[in-house]
Amino acid sequence: MKAMAENTRIGVFGWGIVAPRSPDVAVFEKNLGRATSWLEPFAGFGPSNFLVGRPEFDFGFYKPWIDERFEPRRFSQLNSKMGNTVKYAIGAFIQCLEKNPGIESLLRDLGAQAHVYVGTGLGDFPLQYELVLRYHRAQKKWNQFWCRDEHHSELRSYRVATARDRKRICDDLGAPPDPAGIDPDVEDLDETVERWNAFWVLRSDGLHRYLERSREVEGEGVTGDIDNGKGLLIRRKISSRKKLNAEYGCPTEPWNAVDPNLLWNIPNIPAAQISMLGRITGPTIAPIAACAGFSVSLKMAIDAIRSGQARICVIGMTDPEPHALSVGAFFGARVLSHDGRVSKPFTGMRGTHVSGGACIWIVGDAEYLMGKGFEPLGLEILSVGVSSDADHIITPSEEGPRLAIRQALAEAGIEPEDVATWDMHATATPGDWTELQNTLAVLPGSMAITARKGTFGHGMSVCGGWELTAQHLGFSKGALLPVNLEGNEVHQQIRPYYRRLVQDEARPTEGDVAGKINMGVGGINACAICRRW
């Protein structure tokens, strides 16, 4: 082996998991000991043939931890304002702290030398969907109200005009079709009414008078003492708005129907909440790299630690539970299985399964942390190589992944023949064949290969964390945990290599080096190289 370019050794000193059928790492490891699938039918469209990985999670389990450290209302605030994507990350982070007692205090005491790099692949689709629907319903009611005759003189005149004049008015204004002239059996009447009201509400004289009154209410600023005055002003404005709306009898304004929880759940909030709950004051950033996200966050930590900017980092990814939007989007991209059966890598290439959950690690300068009595988990982290295909948004290239692998090996000082096991991204699509060819072009064919999306599905960004944790859990103890795969299922074109694929029985291993690659939507690749301590 070549000497590493940097001397700082990096270890894992805490990890937490939220995954299908796995609320924590202990259950995750136990489940991995059996070659089964953790997928279940998806009910988001009503009956369908989709299988998904639904995370097993109860945020209430973490209430005692939060109550012990914060004011009594903190848990209820988090529970009501945070979506599950944030909650999964919080739960996994709290799990991390249990692995090495005392590390929580160190994260706080290190100040700017403790970093947080936790991102997401999709954002909180389920929460966004519900809140957008709420706004949309409010906007429809609002438009309909201000298009009534008593609030819209122009539309009132239009309605009593002759058919010829109505056509002329619509043509002159460029108005959408009048729903009064639509056959509901031929066209969607609801959408026609919605487009009609959305056009005419802009010309409502009643609404313009209302907005003039509203400007008077909203135009008042803070006077006198700012700290005392701001609260009084907010309450006074709320009261004045209620009186104004009662006077007009109007529904809730659409801007008042937009829930601020949309803002409290933007992509950097999982990292931000970890920072606040852990009182970690160093840089807190949300890396976004789709399916390669976990190893990209690990790469950021490695770089920060080896450059001397950080001693310890919280890293990871979190994804929402499967939702109609995520399942439908993956299906529309033609990468999702929809036949009611588990689709396994290297078999029928029928597509993958959407999953959600979180994986959070605490990584750091191993000598520094072990010197303080903390014990490393799993494997030593040697390197992460990152590259981009700069080609297709979803179909992997040859050069991009190979470049990431070569970078990681070079940075780790590892020769290809030193790699004993390799975990693949493998989404049970035709891309599995390309990925296998890329792997074998750089690495020797004697290594043992794992691919686990047939077990727990594909979390958009968290999948790499689950897969890397599974590799660490087994390989650090001298074995590769079984995979939900049988030899007779392997695709004919891949069958010449099937003996290298870890299948439904654990496999003892020789050697010390493990590798892992993930390839993300957009063409980003991340390859991690690790070694037994």
Predicted feature locations:
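Active-site-proximal alpha-helical scaffold in enzymes
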Residues: A89-I103, P267-A271, G278, T284-T318, ...
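Active-site-proximal gating segment of KS-fold condensing enzymes and close homologs
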Residues: G123-G282, V327, G332, G431-P444
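Glycine-/small-residue-rich "gating" segment that lines the acyl/pantetheine channel
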Residues: R148-H151, Y248, T252, K299, ...
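Acyl-CoA/ACP chain-elongation machinery
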Residues: A43, Q309-A333, S337-R350, V384-P396, ...
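Condensing-enzyme catalytic core mediating Claisen C-C bond formation in acyl metabolism
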Residues: R9-F13, K30, T36-F42, H338-I414, ...
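Phosphate/pyrophosphate-binding loops at sites that engage ATP/ADP/AMP, CoA/4′-phosphopantetheine
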Residues: C96-A114, L277-G278, L369-F374, A404-T421, ...
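ACP-dependent fatty acid/polyketide chain-elongation machinery
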Residues: M1-L78, T120, Y129, L133-V186, ...
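Active-site pocket-shaping loop/turn-to-helix segments
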Residues: R73-G91, S153-L155, F199-L202, Y210, ...
